[in-house]
Amino acid sequence: MKILEAAIFVCAAAACAVAQGTNGEIAGFRHSPYGEAPAWHGEPPARPAAGAAPILKTSEIRPGMKGVAWTVFQGAQPEPVPVEIIGLWKNAWGPRQDVILAKLGGKAAQTNVAGGMSGSPVYVDGKLVGAIALRISVFSPDAICGITPIEQMLEINAIDESRPLNQKTPQTLAARAELAPPASLLGGGVRLTPIETPLALAGFHESTLRDFRPFFEQMGVTAVHGGAAGAVYDTKPAPGWQNALQPGEAIAGVLVSGDMTVTGLGTVTYNDGKRVLGFGHSFFNLGPVDMPMAKGEVLMVLSSQFQPNKFANMTEIVGALRQDRHSGIMGELGAEAKTIPVSLKVRAQPIPGGPFEEKNYRFNVFIHPRWTPFLMMLTTYNTLQDLNSSAADEATYRLDGTVECEGMPPLRLSNMVASGAGPMPAPMQLAAWWADRFNRLYQSQDGEPQVKRVEAVLEMRPQKLEAVIESAWLDRSEAAPGEEVVARVALRPWRGERITQEFRFRVPSNLPRGEHRILVSNAELLNRPQAVAGLMNRQLGLAQTASLLAQERSNDRLYFSLLTSKPTVYVDDQPMRDVPASVLAAMQSPRSQQRAMAMPETVLPLGEIPLGSLVSGSAALRLKVQ
């Protein structure tokens, strides 16, 4: 380790000897930064306040300048941190994206450049230089940081509503951006990275953080246990928002608020009285956003040469974030962000046949086509951990949900999963299924849904509820149109005795003479053709997508269907029955613009029996119509 540190020191000293820097080099630096940490000489400067501030341009930056940064180490009040400017690293973060290198003293020399310090404003001679936003390497004994010039951050106000291509979302799983300076300058062990934005999760189980850690790591997000000063159910700005988020104070972007909280913590760089700049780098680089913006209270800063972090609570919502860009975030004080109110009722039966225990959760979810489905999955999985802690290994989970969207009828969805019935744990299967419904809605061709509210009931039973269709038969082999026929089905429950279900139906009066088949099946067999037809068309509109989801049959029921020999064509969300052969041939032609899936038979529903358990298997019966 001593050899590695010595090599880094030598490389850094060589870089600092450069008299006149070129692109990607340190310009104008003539002394080593690895001496004494900067300290105060006299009284520390007065704390900055909201309002217009003079700016020190990058062209005026000189090595050796002394300044002050403001950040919160504990509580809500920012403290001054001595700063010494090392030099200007030109084009280090992209074309015309300069970075100012600096060394921190005071408490920051002990904690190092910590996650959550992103956005801490730096002043030289009373002029705003920029925001602490980057760190150089790890295991450094010195608190060396990169400062995003305030000139670049102010450009956020002029950016349009376009969304960047390199967004950090749960589906793109973009790795954290890391910019390696030239090896000839700083050595192979040194690199420039944005300071981690700790994603604080309050009200979440340790098992949830553990199971979702791969998602967070691939997005370059550090997920930590966090807190909130009481559950925040209202997204309206709290009283006194006019005086909130002064420069140097903690700022949080809120992805989930309520009984569960997910927030990203940083520091305020600039406040003009209405708009706020922070972070000095992107949150998730989402572009235009509508995310609740809150104040924060820091509990402590964990010192570390590897990954120091602030631990903080979200306190009050005071506005809304409007932009999330490469050089920082921009928020509007007093604005209210639109979110999705979610209500979850959890019912658990600890003992088979015993009473149910109930819990209710309320929270609001950030609206974004990529993040909303993931947050629905995360929160649902977390509530199931409450159940999983007291359930047996062989448990069954059920979700019944309602999604209300503007201009559409309520979308009712249900699903059941049992432990050991899939490649992943049952709670994760159910949470992933729930998230997929939102993902399909938000990926509609003609716009995003305006979700007004979401309600769901999660139920756990401490035994594996699953039944397999063993056999089926009819009480007669022949019947006339209009006559009643009795169908019986033998099912084998998981580790249980064989049971028989009876279903009565009348032969349709318009059914032609001849042999027909009665299909006894689970939901999956009937859902498959329509699901495949939907996948074949990637250009489904919102109404069509919602229709497809609404038509899905529940997997805890036994279905009875009549099969006829006439073909059915599935186009988008609509089945077309009794299609003439000529029309079918035209629709299946390579020249046809319609994406259709054809089945040789038509399935006519006769009825269903709710079983309250998962159903698997199928059986086909023959019935002759006289």
Show where each model-derived region lies.
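Terminal presequence/propeptide segments associated with secretion/organelle targeting
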Residues: 2, 18-626
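Bacterial N-terminal signal peptides
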Residues: 5-17
